[in-house]
């Protein structure tokens, strides 16, 4: 992103972003301290590479981003597949091709990366179930 010199440029850039289409799919890689220490940057790069090999990187079809901390640090690195909300735990760079292939191409969750088959989404986990995300609802 270019450096913005003033408020006018910021407003212009904001208008530009507002006019861009939302990606149909998004992979959020937790960028919190615990996940970063566990290899989230390498995972992020591996997901970008795998998406690029499928012709999806930086397209309207898919966006791969680092998010803020999700709070479940001992299970990191974490990945959330949107809009489905599939929540993967203890993800490694070696899992990137499977995530891109299964979750994005085939439309199926990678069940070995979720805590239990009945807990595919973050909201299904006991840690997140009582929480209501307000300010950080669009984490990232």
Language-model segments: what does each one mean?
Residues 1-140:
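Feature of Fe-S/electron-transfer and energy-metabolism proteins
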